[in-house]
A protein has these predicted regions:
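Bacterial Sec-dependent N-terminal signal peptides
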Residues: 1-21
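Feature activates predominantly on carbohydrate-active enzymes
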Residues: 59-68, 72, 99-240
């Protein structure tokens, strides 16, 4: 009986170890937003000096920016940034009058004590933090940054060829992301993940359905479903 118990507990232990291993596997779901702490302690400490305190600009995207910076800095730098209003912040966002930046452009500059991120309009503050996070994520030094980004195209959209029945014309990677049968009552959290990923690379529009459109999409009940998705995307500067 002792031998049987030993074999039993050995199997359970092995199975538990396998489950733990599976639970920590990188599935790729987060794509490039899978924030993991780097190994270069010197660059990490330098980044922490900037990232410990952040001053937001007071834009309509402040809450989204706050959540993204908290998520990134906790994972990459193992700190929880403080959000302040004063000049002591190591990362400072503020509105500027440089109209050449357009409605979605931004600047990132760094000095010895702070990184400044000016933009002329709200969307610039949504887009600006992502490349800054990416530099930290890739272990790049944050000294003497002088980045100026202005989108070359006004409309940068993803064109889905999704049918209302969940199929995708010429689709080879599963069913449609949109769960029309659940909307608008249930809004899947994946829609927010999708929008966040798009915003991180400057996508500002999405076409939900196939170009060979099912006319039901224009019915009142389906427009309510579309509106539920639009409410999620709007928070991240994405239009349907």
């Amino acid at each position: 009986s002792c031998i049987i118990l030993f074999i039993f507990y050995s199997c359970i232990s092995h199975l538990y170890g396998q489950v733990q291993a599976v639970s920590t596997v990188d599935t790729g779901y987060e794509l490039w937003l899978n924030y993991k702490s780097g190994s270069n302690s010197r660059l990490k400490q330098a980044a922490i000096r900037y990232a410990s305190q952040v001053r937001l600009a007071g834009s309509q995207y402040d809450e989204v920016i706050r959540e993204e910076l908290e998520r990134a800095f906790k994972a990459l730098l193992e700190i929880t940034p403080g959000f302040v209003r004063g000049e002591e912040a190591g990362i400072q966002m503020s509105f500027c009058t440089d109209k050449r930046l357009g409605k979605e452009g931004y600047i990132i500059r760094s000095g010895k004590k702070r990184i400044t991120l000016p933009a002329s309009y709200d969307a610039g503050f949504l887009y600006g933090p992502f490349p800054l996070i990416r530099l930290i994520q890739c272990g790049e030094p944050l000294v003497q940054l002088n980045i100026r980004e202005i989108p070359a195209l006004e409309f940068r959209q993803l064109n889905h060829w999704d049918d209302l029945n969940g199929n995708i014309e010429r689709g080879y990677a599963g069913k449609s992301l949109w769960k029309w049968e659940e909307l608008p009552e249930k809004v899947d959290s994946r829609y927010t993940d999708y929008a966040r990923t798009n915003a991180s690379i400057g996508i500002n529009g999405v076409m939900l359905n196939n170009v060979n459109a099912d006319p039901r999409i224009l019915r009142r009940d389906f427009l309510k479903k579309v509106a539920a998705l639009a409410d999620v995307f709007r928070i991240l500067h994405i239009r349907v």
